[in-house]
Each structure stands twice: as structure tokens, then as C-alpha cells.
Amino acid sequence: MKPDDKKTILSYGAFLQDKGINFKLFAPNALTVHLVIFDKPEAESGTEYAMMKFDAGDWSYKLKNAGIGTMYGYRLSGPLNDSNVIVADPYSKASITQNSWRHIAKSLVINDEFDWQGDTWLNIPKSDLIIYEAHV
């Protein structure tokens, strides 16, 4: 059995499709993976759905009747994973955390469509860039 998407890193994460969301994660050493859906940002647990394993360690699940604003995480079990911990999607485009010492990182499904109105990438040479990094 193979997933519908192309096998590229860009196909991992959460994608809106046909009145639902397709979730895809790469976890080759996991024995089981559960998608956890949260009702509220402060929730510590949620509804769990067993994901299907495909070739080469890809895990997938189609959540029907869900969309933008869905909060989720993953629970993995296996030799390298603690099944008591819910983890955020490493491929997510947005996340939610609580400002506390013990929070459960949650990923958030967002609308990432934007009309760039024909704008193009600047392609500035790396030698002309000035990049600052700050930790707060």
C-alpha cells in the first residue's frame, strides 16, 4: 500500500483536502503512531486516531470534517519514543504552546494560501545578505 502523495519532504505535515485534513509523518522506527486532536489550546489530552504505516516509515491518517484551526500532535511508541509524551508535528507551519514549565506542544492547521499577485523572489546573493540571530 502506498500513500496518495508524492514521496517528498514537502508531502509531510497536515494538508487540507476534500473537506478534511491529510496528516503525514515520517517515523521509521515507531511501532505505532496516534494522531491526537485537541479541543482547546490548554487541553492536556485529546481524541486519538491510529495512523496507518506505509513504506519506508511513512504514517498517514485522513481526518474527515476538519479544517483550519485544528490543533493536533502525535503520540509515538517504539524503541526511540516515550508513548507518554505527545509531540508536535516537525513539519507543521504553526504551533501552539502554553507559557508554563510543563506544556504540551501542539501543532495548528493554518490557511497558508496567499496571493502573491505575480510577485517574484528577489534572489539576493548570499554575499550581500546581512542576517541577525537573536535569542530572547
Model-inferred region functions:
Residues 33-35, 72:
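Short beta-strand elements bearing conserved aromatic residues within extracellular beta-rich modules
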Residues 1-18, 22, 53-133:
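The feature marks proteins involved in alpha-glucan
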Residues 26-33, 67:
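Short proline/glycine-enriched turn/loop motifs at strand-loop junctions of beta-rich domains
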Residues 31-33, 43, 82:
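Residue-level signal for secondary-structure boundary sites
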Residues 45-54:
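Solvent-exposed serine/threonine-rich low-complexity stretches and specific carbohydrate-binding patches
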